[in-house]
Amino acid sequence: MDCHTKETLGVTQWRRSTMLTLSLLYAITPADGAKEALEYKTWTNHCGLAATLRKVAGGVLTKLKSHISYRKKLEEMETKLRIYALKGDGVGEQKSAEILATTAALMRQKALTPEEANLKTALKAAGFAGEGAAAVSSYLMTLGTLTTSGSAHCLSNEGGDGDGKDQLAPKGCRHGTEADFDAGAGPAESEVADSGFAQVPGKQDGANAGQANMCALFTHQATPHSSQGIYITGAQTKPSFGYGMLTIGTTDQTIGLKLSDIKGKQADSAQKFWSSCHAAVKAAQDMKADPALKVDQTLLAVLVASPEMAEILKLEAAASQQKGPEEVTIDLATEKNNYFGTNNNKLEPLWTKIKGQNIVDLAATKGSTKELGTVTDTAELQKLLSYYYTVNKEEQKKTAEKITKLETELADQKGKSPESECNKISEEPKCNEDKICSWHKEVKAGEKHCKFNSTKAKEKGVSVTQTQTAGGTEATTDKCKGKLEDTCKKESNCKWENNACKDSSILVTKKFALTVVSAAFVALLF
């Protein structure tokens, strides 16, 4: 390529660059004709929409946090109830605490189902709102930069006699900030109506015209590459801003999109984004926040009144009767009164005991304790629950070992009784030869032929002890039997009972044995 050719190309490129610069300058240079700046109310309404959309993320965050708080409070109460049920002293209160804890667990689990849907709703709303706010702010902030020292501008002020760009940020057209994503109240009902975004009614033609001879941006130009203005002819060449928020219809004539009735217009490509944006934002606005809960007797009352409590009480009844839930009916009011008192009058005393329950302080030195009500961290509560579950399990293991030992001792005692000794003899002659045994030819199925004979033992002068069915003992040399009431009462070893004189030592032994057995079974309960 020779020098002349290079010089020619350089000049050509300079001319193109110069023409592009001039065309941008022409767009904001006053000239003959209308060339109006954008009317104040039009563009500030659009900025107001951006401000509304900036609130969406904070609003949905507040609702999501309410869902998390709701479940955490239920978990805190549930865990405290279970710890108390493991550690508390009252059997009846332990049962009530378990029922309340199970109800809280069911409520917490049910809350997860709508929460999953709410997460998607929140994400869509924040995404559409953020994009919409950026689309509006971007186009208007760009128009705000098209100004020259007071002689030209594209955004009219409120009075229609000057540049309004200084009102962009105050009216809502700004860059996004971290504060936009802090929890907040969200848009008001008046801002996001069921039919659309109420603050953008849409305006056309002259209604959007501001101060004249200030902005040639919206002016038609058949040769925009060499003259100020843009090419506006036909459906394919109608420039728009902000995803269709503002469209240039003909020279110096703009159309503001009507958003107050944008609902359900996704099928229209020109309105699809804003209709979808409204649908997403409205869904988030309709999303319900969970009520704030306080972990005290008021939450216990919420549990009692919940539909989940009715489910749990019915399951309790079905389990106790070994039937299916559909096979049983309960008197709900009666069941609630039994567990929680008339008008829930047992709840406050129960909560007082729960929060005042002494528990081990896992973070302190050995032997340190604190009250259960002082613990609010659910992770620490779960550790405490695991601790007391293990303690309770070990105590039950020791109790079971004691019961087994008692049962073995009782079995050994029964195995050494005269009756059992006689039962071991299988031959009639040997049985009858024994001083305390007799052979019975006719016996019931399963019974032994050789049995203990207390009369024979008495006659032979043998003093033996016979184990009773209840585990007690009866002396065969009963000196009280057959005595009259007056004589019986005078004897130190006799007692008048059920119109007969009985050996008091037998009664004492029986009662002692029954007491041991009863104690063993009571121990099983704990």
Curated annotation (Swiss-Prot):
Enumerate the UniProt keywords alphabetically: Cell membrane, Disulfide bond, Glycoprotein, GPI-anchor, Lipoprotein, Membrane, Signal, Trypanosomiasis
Q: Where is the signal peptide?
A: 1-33
**Propeptide feature: residues:** 504-526
Entry membrane topology: Lipid-anchor; GPI-anchor
Gene Ontology, cellular component aspect: plasma membrane; side of membrane
The highest taxon in the source lineage is Eukaryota
What organism is listed for this UniProt entry?
Answer: Trypanosoma brucei brucei
Disulfide connectivity for this sequence is: C47-C173, C154-C215
Q: Where in the cell is it found?
A: Cell membrane
Q: What is this protein called?
A: Variant surface glycoprotein MITAT 1.4A
Q: Write down the glycosylated positions.
A: N453
Any GO BP annotation: symbiont-mediated evasion of host immune response
Instruction: Give residues with lipid attachment (GPI-anchor amidated aspartate).
Output: D503
Q: Region Disordered: what ranges?
A: 157-193
Task: Give the protein's biological function.
Answer: VSG forms a coat on the surface of the parasite. The trypanosome evades the immune response of the host by expressing a series of antigenically distinct VSGs from an estimated 1000 VSG genes.
